[in-house]
Amino acid sequence: ASRYILEMVIQQLPERRMNLKVSHPAYGFETIGVTEYDSKEYVARKKEYIQKWNLTAAVKEMKKQKRGMVIEPERQICVYIDPVTPDPFVVCIKNAVNQWGKAFEAAGWKNVFRFSSDKEDASLSYRTILFRWGSAYNGIYSSVIENPVTGEILCARVNVMDVAADELLGMYFLQCGLLDGRIRKDLHSLAVRQDVLTAQVAAAFAEVLKMKPNKAGYTVFTPADIRSEKWLNRYGITASITSGVTFNYLAQPGDGVSVKNLFPRVSAYDYDAIRYAYGNSDALPSMRGAFYTPEDKLDPYAQDGFLSNDILNASIQGVESVKKIYPQLNGWINRLPEDQNTWKNVSDFAVRAQSLFQTYLTQMVKLVGGRSVRPIIKGVNETLVTYVPREQQVGALN
């Protein structure tokens, strides 16, 4: 016979007014469907409202916010960080959450999140986000509890470990090794692992905010933008962190790009989406190419791992980078610490480099017959389907 211990948390839904926000196709949020009945016209209309945290303040404070002032919510969202989390990675979690905190501040709310490792905050209770260290061997995992009636996010849990970052270090070594000496000195560089994990937590936190992955985020900026330190300091390498982590493989030695700009972060679309959901704005995304786009295998501009709005030239640049790195792999690995300086690593990275080369070629192939489907939005987009221009398809074949 087997014996099990089951734990159950039962929460009474709070009796609070929720400021509902109608869903808009330009922004990707999880939604609830509400059927509204009009007793005057005797008609029923179904509307979609986004799921979000309920930020409230006194009427007097809300008036200040409408005048453009930044205010604090009546009750902050507690971000509990498991005390067993190693100190270097506590910093990663805080930095990632603070990136989103700045987006909320731009929407008119300051000090939305407060950090805690106190025992009394360790329960999955109302307006709490628990960061637990462990049970994240296959990537950062999150679960969210929401009110099915109002769409209010009640609490959330995120399981995180540095194992998630370790899995990307090999890719970072190949894509950014020419620019980041830290990874050439140590394949397990703590500083690099921190940078990778910060980006991963920032991406995962979008799920806690019930934001859908915007697969168009990485294909908004031009290759020149992504190689410009000035541009990167302002926007980073993607218009949205929501679709996961891709590194800046377009930057080259001589571009003057700092290592911090080799990683994605919360950016323009994310700020616009938070402003739409929590601020006083109904504006569309500030960058037209950043409108919400779900994953589409036939759309070359909605794929994981693609970078820039010029996929052909970006892929060619990626191929050229692999050609530069491949002959240097043996020398790089010979200069690594003794436990990493092995023939197995030489062999493994040679195979990975060849696989990366093939990945860039596959990106070019995606242009052939590629098409993009975008929602019809009056005054913005009135064409449902657009196809990759003929010259780009021919260029990919040549």
Regions found by a protein language model. Give the residues of each.
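Conserved catalytic/binding loops enriched for acidic/polar residues
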Residues: 217-398
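The catalytic-center signature of Zn2+-dependent metalloproteases
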Residues: 117-140, 195-252
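Auxiliary tRNA-acceptor-end handling modules of aminoacyl-tRNA synthetases
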Residues: 1-85, 103, 117-167, 172-193
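Divalent metal-coordination and catalytic microenvironments
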Residues: 100, 151, 210
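Soluble non-cytosolic domains of exported or imported proteins
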Residues: 44, 83, 87-95, 191-196, ...
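Loop/turn elements at helix/coil->beta-strand transitions in domains of secreted/extracellular proteins
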Residues: 76, 109-111, 152, 239
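Surface-exposed helix-capping loop/turn segments at secondary-structure junctions
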Residues: 104-113, 207-217, 366-371
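Zn2+-dependent metallopeptidase catalytic core
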Residues: 86-112
